[in-house]
């Protein structure tokens, strides 16, 4: 029982740290925690998977360089248009965001978009 409680506490701390990081971003963005910490099946070697939706530079390498994130974070930077395209194509990242994602910040109203775009055909 103590192990489960410890895992819940650790997960809660990671989510709050990610939420704090997201709230401190100096630009309009929506941030979704995905992956093992969102699902609750993380382990000692898990990273913190984040989908970052914002108006970003065109070059993917420049995007990554421009985002200051804590060690252990795996940030997937997308523009709103790119994210919408992934949703419509049922891309695994978008499906993960819809089914298990935890929205940490939502300047682009992604929550509404997720409900609308991910309805069954």
Tell where the protein language model's regions lie, with residue ranges.
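Catalytic core of pol beta-like nucleotidyltransferases
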Residues: 1-30, 38-45, 54-121
């Amino acid at each position: 029982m103590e192990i489960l409680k410890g895992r819940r506490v650790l997960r809660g701390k990671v989510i709050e740290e990610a939420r704090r990081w997201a709230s401190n971003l100096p630009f309009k963005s929506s941030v979704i925690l995905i992956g093992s910490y969102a699902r609750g099946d993380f382990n000692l070697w898990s990273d913190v998977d984040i989908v970052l939706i914002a108006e970003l530079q065109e070059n993917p390498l420049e995007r990554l360089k421009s985002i200051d994130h804590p060690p252990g974070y795996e940030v997937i930077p997308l523009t709103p248009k790119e994210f919408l395209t992934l949703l419509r194509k049922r891309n695994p990242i978008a499906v993960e965001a819809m089914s298990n994602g935890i929205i940490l910040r939502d300047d682009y109203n992604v929550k509404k978009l997720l409900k609308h775009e991910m309805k069954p055909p």
